[in-house]
Amino acid sequence: MSGRLWSKAIFAGYKRGLRNQREHTALLKIEGVYARDETEFYLGKRCAYVYKAKNNTVTPGGKPNKTRVIWGKITRAHGNSGMVRAKFRSNLPAKAIGHRIRVMLYPSRI
């Protein structure tokens, strides 16, 4: 068996009001999810922003490489169109807006 163990999502921006932006909560658009009740499956799932940096970092049990990850968790639905809110260990950088986020299919709640 091969293939992805994660769903594709796009980082759409930060949670915000009309004038204030709250960077501690990210808004994600998950591919194939278009209604609020479809987001139920993804609540509590881990998500990851994978990116490459300039310098190598040591990875546990592997060679040093340029790949880095910011981990987060999907917390709740946002609106009625299948968007979700996620909190990351450190806030996502603004340059990540419009880029891919991996939504892992664990932990399972079924």
Swiss-Prot record:
Keywords: Acetylation, Cytoplasm, Ribonucleoprotein, Ribosomal protein, RNA-binding, tRNA-binding
Chain positions with N6-acetyllysine modification: K8, K63
InterPro entries per the UniProt record, alphabetical: Ribosomal_eL33, Ribosomal_eL33_CS, Ribosomal_eL33_sf, Transl_B-barrel_sf
SUPFAM superfamilies in alphabetical order: Translation proteins
Signal peptide feature range: none
Residues the record lists as N6-succinyllysine modifications: K63
GO biological process, one term: ribosomal large subunit biogenesis
One term under GO cellular component: cytosolic large ribosomal subunit
Subunit-level organization: Component of the large ribosomal subunit.
PANTHER family referenced in this protein's UniProt entry, alphabetically: 60S RIBOSOMAL PROTEIN L35A
Role according to the record: Component of the large ribosomal subunit. The ribosome is a large ribonucleoprotein complex responsible for the synthesis of proteins in the cell. Required for the proliferation and viability of hematopoietic cells.
The protein's name in its UniProt record: Large ribosomal subunit protein eL33
Organism in which the protein naturally occurs: Bos taurus
Gene: RPL35A
